């Protein structure tokens, strides 16, 4: 990945984060259940909204969700920096065999995808919600674009999926997206 590409992503992510803060201050989120407390508790929705904004600029991402204890956190990673493999282990073959016994369709396809994030470029605009928490390293970076750092290593990744624009566009998300993007400079 070229430095100028990372710079472009950082500029876009910073603009999007800034627009969220302006929209919040303007009262755009007063009737929403989560965004009045941005960035606290908004990482999942924010990641989806940012993924859509980046896709509008031909930057494609995976949505990543991780867990540390009872706390979850979501962020994005660039698609072209993630290695995806499938598992064909004995356990998967046995599970597939068991499913085929109970399935009318004996042609069962079971592939678990594994996402190697070791060299992934992370885009996270809500990490600073953990600023006051020692167990999260007092993480205070509002916009992070870079490789896996100590903070993101804290989370056991539970989910990694490609951003699908149509999957999040309920009325609430459409409203949030419009409210945010009208403040992008």
Stretches found by the model and what they are:
Residues 1-185:
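A structural boundary/capping signal
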